């Protein structure tokens, strides 16, 4: 795994990066805080059994905000990742306007059809577009999960319907 995170306004992003890496280490893994995207460094870190924890950063302009969704997408594509997982405040793609249930999985073609007939909040559309970009650029699956749910990752991966929505290119790519 590779962790890309956002840093709340007013918080030192490098200190936050170190804090997240330390939290992972307290869970029994090795983690290393990294700034920026360098595929060779990521491969080296992973091959030495470390989890890279990345804070999006522009070395030339540290005050410039870089969207972690953009960074995560770039890394997933460059690393030829199998999965890209966005932890958000959304539980996934709602099946209807009542927001009572989400699609456990949906193809990119089905997403395009939904976008023609349904209105999605602007910030959710950003997640959805990043997922679509990911699957069209070679990532097999892109997940939208509610990061506020405790144990959301194991629920997503070890239950039949999961905990959110996985966007796939087509049905054949679900279990590649």
Go through each PLM region and give its residues.
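Nucleotide/pyrophosphate-binding catalytic subdomain
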Residues: 1-148, 171-176
